[in-house]
Amino acid sequence: MQMENLITTFPEIEIKEHEPLAHYTNTKTGGPADWLAFPVDVAQVQQLVDYCHQTGLALTVIGNASNLIVRDGGIEGLVMILTRMQTVKVEGTMVTAAAGASYIEVTKIARDHSLTGLEFAAGIPGSIGGAIFMNAGAYGGETKTVVDHVTVMERDGQIHQLSNEEMDFGYRHSAVQASGAIVLDATFALKLGDQNAITAQMEDLNARRAAKQPLELPSCGSVFKRPTGYFAGKLIHDAGLQGYTSGGAQVSTKHAGFIVNVNHGTATDYLNVIHHVQETVQEKFGVQLETEVRIIGRQS
């Protein structure tokens, strides 16, 4: 089976060839995927995973690409974007959301059912799959605190469930980062609450986010992990790096923990800014900043 037959092999799945990933990433940067597929359900994911397993074609899975930098050289092989898998089901206090569902939309559905526990995620721009992959969190909350179980597909096509404990959640970490398993859906165990109180908390957190973060510009969200005993944004601010620019990428003047695309920036611009920030903070404070953002793809 030849790779060049991928589109004709799966006529029922939308697949694009040499598709620029800048059209899909929140940074508006990133080179082309050799192939970009848009599965709409688990059966289509299964077909593509089986094909890659059998042929050895490289497979990369992405969601909303909100905390992701794709290098300008693009991505080899097949990229599967799961954002068309958006089903959300509510049963009592349990909410099951497909990998491509918007985390923000899931928090709204929970609110509409008077379910509390997901308020912290009201403004997190990623998909459910991405949130599970990196144990996304904000304002003192973490995804791991409300996950009951996760359905995953291994790279050989096997599907099974992982409990919260088996997911091995940590700070911006989960078991699927190392295993390569693909998140298909996640079930959240929530509690009945007061809808007005839930709404008020979500609105408060969204207002705080809008006041402090550069939501009006393309970015990849929080770039660096929180170093033990420090705040990355404060270190970057204290190093005098706010406003530092390379090409079209800039350390946000609104929040030092963000790098924004101010003028047709490239992934290389982003990576240059990240490297300069890391070097400067290390030099001035002796603190090594680790990236939270996922960086993938070929060198340009």
Curated annotation (Swiss-Prot):
Domain of life of the organism encoding this protein: Bacteria
Cellular component annotations (GO), alphabetically ordered: cytosol
GO biological process: cell division; cell wall organization; peptidoglycan biosynthetic process; regulation of cell shape
SUPFAM superfamilies: FAD-binding/transporter-associated domain-like, Uridine diphospho-N-Acetylenolpyruvylglucosamine reductase, MurB, C-terminal domain
Function of the protein: Cell wall formation.
Family membership: Belongs to the MurB family.
Name by which UniProt lists this protein: UDP-N-acetylenolpyruvoylglucosamine reductase
Record organism: Limosilactobacillus fermentum (strain NBRC 3956 / LMG 18251) (Lactobacillus fermentum)
